[in-house]
Regions:
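Short, glycine/acidic-enriched capping/hinge loops at junctions between secondary-structure elements
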Residues: 42-44, 56, 69
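Alpha-helical support elements that line or immediately flank enzyme active sites
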Residues: 69-80
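A cross-family signal for key residues in well-ordered alpha-helices
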Residues: 44, 74, 117
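Short beta-strand elements
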Residues: 34, 39-49
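C-terminal binding/interaction regions
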Residues: 1-24, 29-30, 54-55, 80-132
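Immediate flanking context of iron-sulfur cluster ligation sites
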Residues: 51-60
Length: 132
């Protein structure tokens, strides 16, 4: 894809967000922000019986990159386990979004993934504590 294609994709996900809205019930629910840009993202995830993400949604406000990235992330992480989410690479996400386009705003681009990784770690720790 060229720069224009990446910009078009980001604008499409910003203007027509996929999986936007709260999710009830949700096993994971976490929020975070990027004070420098005023971005806010809240992610909701529901897991199936095998520990895979069966539903993932987001709510938020902020710049095009943070909101489009959160929307794209809801599709990328669908079907993954929490361990797979924790292993997701920020670099890979930036490549999917278009490195040339989002490289000036990496914190905006990776905000959703940071929140999801943190929520996955917290959930996994709580599950382990409950089992011991």
């Amino acid at each position: 894809l060229n720069r224009e294609d990446y910009v078009e994709t980001l604008l499409d996900y910003y203007e027509n967000p996929r999986n936007r809205g709260s999710l009830d019930p949700a096993h994971l629910h976490a929020s975070g922000g990027n004070p420098g840009c005023g971005d806010l993202v809240t992610l909701y995830a529901r897991l199936d019986d095998t520990g895979h993400i069966e539903a993932l949604s987001f709510e938020g406000e902020g710049c095009t990159i943070s909101q489009a990235s959160a929307s794209i992330l809801t599709e990328l992480a669908q079907g993954k386990t929490l361990a797979e989410v924790e292993a997701m690479s920020y670099d890979d996400l930036i490549d999917v979004l278009g490195r040339e386009v989002v490289s000036v705003r990496p914190r905006c681009a990776t905000l959703g993934l940071s929140i999801l990784k943190s929520a996955a770690q917290d959930y996994t720790k709580a599950e382990r504590a409950q089992q011991s």
